[in-house]
Swiss-Prot record:
It comes from Geobacter metallireducens (strain ATCC 53774 / DSM 7210 / GS-15). Belongs to the RecO family. One of its GO terms (cellular component) is bacterial nucleoid. Keywords: DNA damage, DNA recombination, DNA repair. This is DNA repair protein RecO. The gene is recO. The keyword Membrane does not apply. Involved in DNA repair and RecF pathway recombination. Pfam families: RecO_C, RecO_N. HAMAP family: RecO. One of its GO terms (biological process) is DNA recombination.
Amino acid sequence: MESTRTEAIVLAAMDYRESDRIVTLFTLQYGKVRGVAKGAKRSARRFGPALEPFARIGVELVVREGLSSLRGADIVTLYPGIRRDLRAIGLAGYAVELVDRYLPDGAPSPRLFRLLSSYLERLDQGEPLPSDRRFFEANFLNILGYRISLDHCASCGVELPATAERRTGASGMILCANCGRYGASVGPEAAALLGRCIATGRFGAVLFSPQSLREAGTLLDGAIAAHLTRPLNSLAFLKQIEPD
């Protein structure tokens, strides 16, 4: 079969047999692709360090149902700034695992590819900001069709004005104070900033206060977990280094 070339971000890689690796890629053209890189463990010329997690690469592959075949890869960037910072490593690992777990095989999403690329570039530039993680998550959910409705109660449907008290419900839903009397509070500031995350689409444009960051984090954590069958492997480590 004829090979094709596309840009990709490495989501995961594992050793396979004596000399091969199985690699999960998020490609710009084909979406998520799993493939075998034959001889990757011994061929520095064809692959080198290009198959490391969250590397951005140009990859030559033969796309097939099931496992594709990787013919070669060139490094666009390894994001060296990320690899020098423990918190950045944890956040990048969380982001690529989130994409891997949510995205089905063979479903291209150029918007999500740009979002993930922008987040990795942001992490590569220096000290990771807690607000950036929540910005990424809010836009991630929006792109995949899981946007949290901030304007109406998910239970009774009542409209929630900007100054209304909001509560978290099951599965990361927003409830009015009456329906969500036992849920955690989401104040007007947190709700407004979450809305701005979607509206601006630019890292660094939205900064949460410590309180609004906690409130938004509780809501987003619930919304993300609601669509997963098991916890993310990266989450336990991330919670140790990124408490908010």
